[in-house]
Curated annotation (Swiss-Prot), chain B:
GO CC annotations, alphabetized: cytoplasm; nucleoplasm; nucleus; perinuclear region of cytoplasm; tRNA (m2G10) methyltransferase complex
Keyword set, alphabetical order: Cytoplasm, Nucleus
Domain called TRM112: residue spans: 2-120
Record family assignment: Belongs to the TRM112 family.
Organism whose genome encodes this protein: Drosophila melanogaster
Keyword Nucleus attached: yes
Name used for this protein in its record: Multifunctional methyltransferase subunit TRM112-like protein
Keyword Hydrolase in annotation: no
Amino acid sequence: MHVEETQQKVNKAKKADKKQRRCLAIIKSDCEVSPSAEPTPYLAVLNVGLSNGLTEECLLTEAAATGGKVIQVVMLPGKSYCFFICASLEDSQLIYEGMHNISTIGQQGAVAYLSYIRQLPALAGKSEWNKPLPRGLHIIADFVTEEEESTLLRAIGEDGRTSEGTGSLKHRNVKHFGFEFLYGTNNVDPSKPLEQSIPSACDILWPRLNSFASTWDWSSPDQLTVNEYEPGHGIPPHVDTHSAFLDPILSLSLQSDVVMDFRRGDDQVQVRLPRRSLLIMSGEARYDWTHGIRPKHIDVVPSASGGLTTQARGKRTSLTFRRLRKGPCDCSYPALCDTQQTKVPQELHASLAAQAITLEQQNVHEVYDKIADHFSETRHTPWPQVSEFLDSFEPQSVVLDIGCGNGKYLSCNPLLLSVGCDRAQGLLAVGRRKGQNVFRCDCLVVPVRSSSIDGCISIAVIHHLATKERRLAALQEMARVLRPGGRALVYVWAKDQRKNDKKSTYLRQNKAVNKERTTEQQQRQKQHQELEQQLSNNNPLPVHTNRTEFQQQDVLVPWKTKDEQKTTYLRYYHVFEEQELENLVSQVHEVQLIKSYYDQGNHCAIFEKISKNSL
Amino acid sequence: MKLSTYNFLTSVAIKGVKVGFPLKLTINKKEVVESEFNPTFVERILPKLDWSAVYGAAQVAELTEDIPAVQPENIVENELLLQKLHHLLFEIDVLEGQLECPETGRVFPISDGIPNMLLNEDEV
Ligand SMILES: [Zn+2]
């Protein structure tokens, strides 16, 4: 028995050796790889790759299970093999021993064969590195000498304003000269120059740029941000705010090389920034591509022979030189342009007024009818401060929920007589099934006796109305049905989804951004491309990207259905600026504002109908 | 639709309508949903209701033997009446029927227990 088992093992190993050799021979006919009997940091997976439907994720999971650390997976399109670059020899050994002839990641659960190789084939580097640089991107190698490097480091080491180490900044040290770059708003305050301007040690740099500078907006910068990156630190992909800075933006790399990623939509280009080189981002590269650095200890870069190799990062200091714009941006790259994305043309107000009813019909009522059930599933937990308001009424008060949706607030306080109304039949039916009192109407024409109601709530409703007049009319209608002394609570979505630098739940649910896997800008650009394919282009309004900050007040917010079609519906919203709700309430007759507050990305107001006696 | 809800509904928003209340109720199908009787609840809700519409509802629901045409004064002590009001206002559920504007005759259908009070733009 024991002998048999041993024999089987030997047979299996022999079979694996044979397979390994055969696969290597096939790969060799394809590209130059030389196997190594001794462990190397490079591993080839010989019999499975992209052409077999293998994903990088699957590979990384398998490798992680062995305890070995992978720096990069190299997969080539259309090939049935792929490569690992491992963090160290030990990691490489762990992966080899844990996966070779063991891992069943092949087609139909076939076992994978691995081999150490001396170097990655030249082919592997091509797809990643042989792309042209983004237009307007230049790298000037050896822009400063080693001597100048030390002089510059000394000069910036002495002074400058240090950023508070919060948020994404916790990973690196940041200093500012000229003006402070505010990471919260990604902007500068031109009215607040810093005492310390750019150190004069930097003056040697500008004459060297004469040949370029003829086409630039500026010839010397007035703002410098210094970032110190330890190995493993990075910066999420971003574009420098268009309206904050002129074209171009310069970045001098000191102390260590690094690889920077440039992206535009699905396009991605990796760019090596050697120590003491100057990066120039101008035109398209400055305005239409995001740039970022992945938080890694080791970069994978092209080797001298054309393959790939690894390069450990050292401590790197970058000097980013910019010049303040002090006005709107006039670039021709609207996708990431804050000026062009936030501009509310005068005509928009006129067109909203003209189309209000059609817009609300198509982009509010019809959408809610279509998404009623799915929407209702996502709306089950009452907001605590709304419940609190409902609990503040005497027992047996009559409370009307205008725009009650699925009626989640109608059963919050069973001591009240709660009645709800909404336009969306599908949502009313959900509430009705739960035994609630509901009827169908429009929030502008509420079929309820005047002065008959003790309390009124309107939660996330009037931001669906397309003009100020209509929003005001909805509040006036609430005031009409309230009895004197009766109180109303209104919630509307806030344009600003942060308070005191804290993100609302809406933003916090954007996990990819919060974990710095991507940025809002990246997501906007991606959605922009997706929607262009999916929807007709004659949307009257800009389309908002979910779980990102609002760029403008009147927007269409996508709702993706959960079914297989994944249909995108666009809901119209007017998101409120600070004080806008209070101002609106102040224009309603017969009421006074009791309280207003910000709650989870909403502006909220409580008002009371003035009793006749106090008039 | 419970008859307590009915008590609040009006067609006053229709162009030219002066009062629009009480609406003319027709019940084609109803059911009785039993609920716990709480005399205090009924008693405290009453001042918020319009008695003419309470009585009107009782007429349509054929409960006029229980509900007087004029609101009695000492209703607090009349627990039997409170119980009957509880039944009328909170237990009778209109599933199918209609509400009609007393001035224009505009009909608002009630189906699956939900009155549709939506007006067209040109009606208001
Ligand atoms: Zn711009």
